[in-house]
Structures are given as structure tokens and as C-alpha cells.
Amino acid sequence: MDADVVVRALAEAAALEPANVLLRIRLAYARKAAGDVNGAVAELASTVQTVPSSPDAWLALAGLLMEIELATLSGRARGGTSPLAHALVAFEQALALAPEAPAVLAPAAMAHAYACAWPRAEALLASLAAIGRAQSGPFPVSPLMAAALLDDPALQQRAIRDYVAGTLPPPRPRAPAAIRARGTALRVGYLSADFHEHATAYLAAGLFEHHDPARVASFAYAIDRDDGGPMRARLRRAFGQWRDLAGLDDATAAARIAADGLDVLVDLKGHTQGSRLGILATRPAPVQIHYLGFPGTLAYAAVDALVADPIVVPPGDERHYAEAVLRLPRCYQVNDRSRPRPPAPSRASVGLPERGLVLASFNQGYKLTRAYVEMWLDTLARHDDAVLWLSVTHVPARGNLRAAAAARGIAPERIVFADYAKQPQHLARLACADLALDVLPYGSHTTGSDALWCGVPLLTHTGSTFAGRVGTSLVDAVGLREFATGSLEEYRAMLESLASSRARLADCRRHLERGRLDFPLFDTAGFARDFERLLEDAANRRFAAAP
């Protein structure tokens, strides 16, 4: 149905029932889908005025404002006041009405984390975790928020499981796989909405290109629309077969996939934006696994297994995963060794001092927890020539970070904020850093391997969840395991040691530069062979029935 027709129909209904909150929320999102973002915000702003006692209305307004804020960060839309600041106000109204609802606590904590408003974020997170541990009932938290906020793998799994139960259809039972003729190539499909200029494509393009056609017949199932960009064209060339599924409903898309007679379907999205896990519900392939998109369990019975390595999911942690865990013998994260290495610009051109120590963290703002930022600021206080380089773009977060620095007597110009940049420019500027800094509970993934590719060592802290252990897997795969610390105290000591020994940092940089094309992390062809063996094992494996 035409989007404008839907808006008109809902508007007419809402005019008759102005206090019907659910109807007005539907109208707001219909306006957004029709391209009228301002109209959507106005609709929800009017709704909270009409029904100020509805936590759902305030939550919907806050959520829409967060969506606008995050769209702004991509560089597609800039300027104006910060939607995040207004979202925080709306979240507080929702919390006043529903202080113990996980569906309110989790996004409110996440929004305050984006703003680096740590006291409030920590208080909300403590309440959320306490409720999750105390209650035996449903504890639905969106998977990204669970991965970002909950540093407890058991609680994380429960939150994602309960979220899935309320949002995804129950899958069909697994059908027996057809017997594959000996010597024929494994038929493998990749399902993604990221077949364009996206971190997943930057990482995995080389894998698709390095598949041995004698071993793997590769199929791409694109649920994103063609942007006409160079990455899309490159990926089209890489795959043996290409299927455009954008615009199809789940059942039709699944039928198209099933018609190709796959042995294994690899979902590359998981619980991330643009995911279409509902396509897997009808089991278009006899074996369905998840790889790369989401760092943790999908807790969905349509997914048989996930791809990991011995570091991100160590032996004994399988109980925290609803799927079977398939481990690669190397870092699970594929990297494209053909990605660019542009020459580094001058430090001055990216807002940095030409001399001195540059400590960088290009993680998104919600990952920057207080314990780590305070350690970094303490390092700046001890080393007068050091600066902290961050990619935080949220206006409230920048203000809070500057305030934290000022409280320690650190001049504001020693906190340097990097704006959004496209991949070639981003990789070029990364080389201006001396040391990349990781965080917990959700650490560096693509940002970490980008730094290592550009010759910048990564200081990390091994966490307790998949999302918090990727940094350790990355540094291990480039021969820098000593950069993976086991506690905050070790992290602090290592940071001080490195800041005090610029020669050691220079040696590490030379190590990364000399061995870049020899490290397992950047051996794309070798990774492809290991991944093909994993796919063959998955195709031949009898997975236990999902609970």
C-alpha cells in the first residue's frame, strides 16, 4: 500500500481517537516511513501532551529522537540542535511512569551512555541488571543494548532470548539435508543488508573473492537496495550468483533462497540494523549459521550455529550460546588485505598537535565507560604532551567529556574530536595515532583491526562476553598478546608503561608494519581456506534439535 495512503488512513482514525496512544505511534512511524520525519516527531510530541501519563508515548518519542540522532552521525544529515538531548528528557518522563520496566530502562541507559552521562547511565544499568537477576519472568532487552550494557553472558543470553520470543516467528523444524554428490562444490549462501559501503563489506569482501569455486559455489542474497557504489559492484563480481531480495516479504525471500538448493546459509546480520532473521524461520537451507554481524548468541532456534574462535568463546562458555559454537583455528574476524593503506596526512590537518603522544579511541560514544575514560584522562594529567583523540560526535557527549577533562585540570584542546570520515580518509588519519585504546564491556571490533592494519598497536582488556573479547583475539593474531590485559589494574599499568616508553611504542609500530602481510589476521586467502573447512564441517554435522 502507498505510504501516503497509509498516513491518511491512520490520521483519520487518530483524529477520531486522539487518546489512542498505540494508534498515534503507528501514525508517527507511518509519517517517518513516508519521509516526513518532522511530522513524525510532531505527532509524538502532540501525543505526550494529550496523554502525558503514557510511558509508551514518551518511550516512542525518545526512541524516534534517538533514531534521528544516530542517522545524523553517519554524516548524511548534520546541523541543528541535538535530538539526543531531547531524547534524554523524554526517557526521564518514561522512567518516572515505568521505573522498573526493562523496555524503558535499557534504551534509557543506552541513551545516557551515548551522551557519556555516566552517573545516570550507571544507575539505570544497575537497576536493569538487578531486575534481570531478581525476576524469573520475561526480561526482554534489545540485543545491541544487551551486548553493550550487560557484562554478564548469562544475563545477556536471557535478555536476547526473551527479546527474540516476542519479536520473531517460531521456526519450522529442521528438514533433513539432501545428500550431496561426492566431489561437488558446497552451495553456500550469504544473507546480508550490508552489501555496500559498510564495515561488514569492508571486512568480508576478500573472503568472498578468495572462495575456491571448486569447493564453494557462492550465492549472495542482498536484502539492501543497490546503492550503485563501488563496493556493491565489487561484491557482485565476487559472488558466483547474486540474488536481490530487497522489497520481498520474508516468505517470498525464503522461497527464493530455498529454490537454490543450498547446503549452508550464512546470515551476516544477526541482531543488527536491517536484519531479516524472519527469512530463516521457514528454514530455506538445511544448515543455517550466523557469522560476523552480531557478537553473541542470536538465541533463535532457526540458527543452528555461530562462528567464533577459542578466544571470543573460550571452551566452557558454550552454555551461554543457544547455538552450536563453531570455532575457527584463528581470529574469527576476516580482514581484507587488499583494503587501502593511504598515506597518513599531517597531524595538523586532522586537528592534532604535530608532536607528542596521541592516544586514540575510535569507538562509538556508548562504548566509552567512565572507568576507561578516567584512566585515559589520568594519563593525560601525568604526560603534558599527550592528547586524547576520540570519534564521539554526539553534542551532549562532547560536552560531558570536556567537563570530565576540566575537572582534572586538563585543557579542552587536549581532547580532540574527529568527525565522520569515509573509509579511505579514516584509514589514512588513523596512522596519526600512537596507541589505540579499547574498552569494555563492548570493545573494538572493526575499529581495532583498522588500527592494527594502519600500524597502530591496540591496548585491550579481555572481557567476559564475545563483544568484550574481540580485541584480545585481534592482538593475539598480530603477535601482540601482551597488549591484552586481564584487569583494570593491568590495563592502567600497561597504559602508563607505554606512555612512558615511546621507544616501545615505536618498536610495536615497526612490528606491525613489517609483519602486516604475514600476520594471520590479514591472511585473507588462508582465512578463506579455514572458513571453507568450517562450512564443510557444518554441512556434514548433525546439529541437536533446538530447545
PLM feature spans:
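Alpha-helical solenoid repeat scaffolds of the TPR/TPR-like class and their adjacent stem/linker regions
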Residues: 1-353, 403-409, 422-435, 447, ...
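Short alpha-helix at the nucleotide-sugar/activated-sugar donor binding site of glycosyltransferases
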Residues: 451-453, 476
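Short hydrophobic beta-strand element within catalytic cores of glycosyltransferases
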Residues: 457-466
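Short Ser/Thr-rich beta->loop micro-motif in glycosyltransferases that lines
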Residues: 269, 438-444, 462
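Glycosyltransferase donor-sugar binding loop
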Residues: 222-227, 387-400
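Short hydrophobic "strand-cap" motifs at the C-terminus of beta-strands
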Residues: 191, 362-363, 391, 418
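Short acidic/histidine- and often glycine-rich active-site loop of Leloir-type glycosyltransferases
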Residues: 468-479
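Short hydrophobic signal-anchor/transmembrane segments that target glycosyltransferases
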Residues: 207-214, 370-384
